[in-house]
Amino acid sequence: MAGHSKWANIKHRKAAQDAQRGKIFTKLIRELVTAAKLGGGDVGANPRLRAAVDKALSNNMTRDTINRAIERGVGGGDGTNMETRIYEGYGPGGTAVMVECLSDNANRTISQVRPSFTKCGGNLGTEGSVGYLFSKKGLILVESADEDALTEAAIEAGADDIQVQEDGSVEIYTAWEDLGLVKDGIEVVGFKVVNAEVTMIPSTMVDLDAETAPKLLRLIDMLEDCDDVQNVYHNGEISDEVAALL
């Protein structure tokens, strides 16, 4: 597993995400409804739904709102046929970018995604152009803990890898289907999970300087502002020194 901190990338974007929480909630609800519609409302038997619930909780969505979304999905939703679509491309500095969308209209979605790449000096690629650089994983963050005890609990629960970061936080990687099981396994013995999500982990990283980093962040902002875009993944790495200049 690459030795970078995925959570560092999440943290430096959190303020911007908080500013558009309403749009984030809309996207989370769309995923909850779709996951329940496709796989049923039992989180124990539906890994996609469990991952959606964990992500919603990490974003402070109430249980009541989550349950209503699941009930909508089990009841068939609103009749629209939402499909997951993955677009791949290259961003500033030669970064690899994957865009996960949930949409009922492919033409509308591509008309949102393609201009974002073009305006930021990137280009949309073909299927498979950068996907091979990423692995779908579950990622759990524990801010600080007894490293040995947490490692033992995580391995016992089925974790694939554990990484301790410089700030003392611990990142736990799992098979994406096992995210909920591992999260439960470490919480039941007393560890507090700060964040749990299914994500795409890059196998190699591209270091970004103070000139290129803002361009990539602008691309991510533009993509995340598209209604059909659920998640944006990339392999750009922004050091603490560069982040301090942004």
Curated annotation (Swiss-Prot):
Primary location: cytoplasm
GO molecular function: DNA binding
Localization of this protein: Cytoplasm
GO cellular component, one term: cytosol
Short name of any one Pfam family annotated for the protein: Transcrip_reg
GO biological process entries: regulation of DNA-templated transcription
InterPro entries: Integrase-like_N, TACO1_YebC-like_2nd/3rd_dom, TACO1_YebC_N, Transcrip_reg_TACO1-like, Transcrip_reg_TACO1-like_dom3, YebC-like
Keyword terms: Cytoplasm, DNA-binding, Transcription, Transcription regulation
Family: Belongs to the TACO1 family.
PANTHER family: TRANSCRIPTIONAL REGULATORY PROTEIN YEBC-RELATED, TRANSLATIONAL ACTIVATOR OF CYTOCHROME C OXIDASE 1
Name of the protein in question: Probable transcriptional regulatory protein HS_0508
Species name: Histophilus somni (strain 129Pt)
